[in-house]
């Protein structure tokens, strides 16, 4: 779930809490896709990014890396550097810092019609994909 950050849309970056169903966002293939559903839930287990402090995701989020999707739960309870997939550049090294919040914050899970993820503050973050036949 995305707790804090700006999702890349066809109109430019937009705060996650403002993303609505039907909106067009940019998927991990750098293609436009439609948001089919936005689910909201409280989160306490998080991953912070040392070089991207305005991005905060839940521990169960998928993170797009140079080598494929990394499940956030696999990040050990100490800081770990990963080569993260970006929209502007092929990849970028950043240090992932798992942690626990003092109080729960709202997180948002997006379901899109294609792409397996979206760009948030420049990094690829996994989301649900639901295709229609």
Model-identified regions with their sequence ranges:
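Autoprocessing domains of the Hint superfamily
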Residues: 1-133
């Amino acid at each position: 779930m995305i707790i804090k950050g700006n999702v890349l849309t066809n109109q430019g970056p937009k705060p996650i809490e403002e993303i609505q169903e039907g909106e067009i966002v940019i998927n991990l293939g750098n293609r436009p896709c439609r948001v089919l559903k936005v689910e909201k839930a409280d989160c306490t287990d998080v991953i912070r990014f040392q070089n991207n402090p305005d991005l905060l995701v839940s521990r169960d989020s998928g993170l797009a890396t140079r080598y494929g999707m990394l499940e956030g739960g696999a990040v050990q309870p100490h800081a770990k550097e990963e080569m993260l997939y970006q929209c502007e550049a092929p990849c970028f090294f950043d240090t992932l810092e798992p942690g626990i919040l003092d109080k729960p914050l709202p997180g948002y899970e997006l379901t899109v019609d294609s792409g397996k993820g979206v760009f948030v503050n420049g990094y690829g973050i996994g989301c649900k994909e639901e295709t229609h036949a």
